[in-house]
Amino acid sequence: MAKNTEIERKFLVKSDAFIAQATTSYEIMQGYLCKDPEKTIRVRIRDTRAFLTIKSSLLRDGIAKFEWEKEIDLSDAKELMKICLPGAISKTRYIIKVKGERLKVKGERTKDKGDSLKWEVDVFHGRLEGRVLAEIELSDEDEAFERPDWLGEEVTGQPQYYNANM
């Protein structure tokens, strides 16, 4: 898989049972400098760290997307947030790590038992209060994974669930 390729699947969350499984959580504030349907430029502040991220579906097929991310100075991020498009997002992100099984993925690779997969569950605040989404990042589009009981309907690829469109 190319270094700048991100493969994520996104789901609605039907209960708050994930909170008991979370190993950590942190606050995120993010805004967008560009929200073109095929590419986004995002500024994100996560606690005391900040990142500039470019995502695009132009160079990839399926659910894989190009992603480039660079850590930037917190002061620079705060200045960039001032020029972001309206509709900044505030959310709490919960991290849930789960053990992988011996799952076959495309080609000859396998994910050994003990390898961990990571769920990121976002609980939105402010104008998006009540929205809760979960994402899992995979190494291959065909990689299998166990679905937790708290997971709801899959919404991967549905534009209304892209953070940039909320």
Would you name each region that the model predicts?
Residues 1-166:
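Phosphate-end processing signature that detects enzymes handling 5′-triphosphorylated RNA
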